[in-house]
Amino acid sequence: MEKTQKEVTELSSKQRAYLRGRANEEPVVLHIGKEGIVPNLIKQGWDALEARELIKVQLMKGAPYESAREACGVLCEKLHALPVQCIGKRFVIYRRARKDAKIELP
């Protein structure tokens, strides 16, 4: 019997902790610069999430956002992703891949 993939709309604390642990090993994939979140950055983020499911993003100096938390909210909304962690100028987001999901949440 095939397992059906259910769409995750919110992460539990156990799932967030698991993803935070996996994110420690991941390099920064996206950099948000002075232009902010532009269509090209959204495309790169979309492709990265499909390939990796879990990506780390860094807010560069001069970015038009007050905090990484604000940028995380905007990017998550545009990418239909879920925030995992936000520390300093970096944050981690997660979205299950539509095909070939690599990360099994607890």
Give the role of each language-model region.
Residues M1-P106:
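Positively charged, polar, low-complexity stretches
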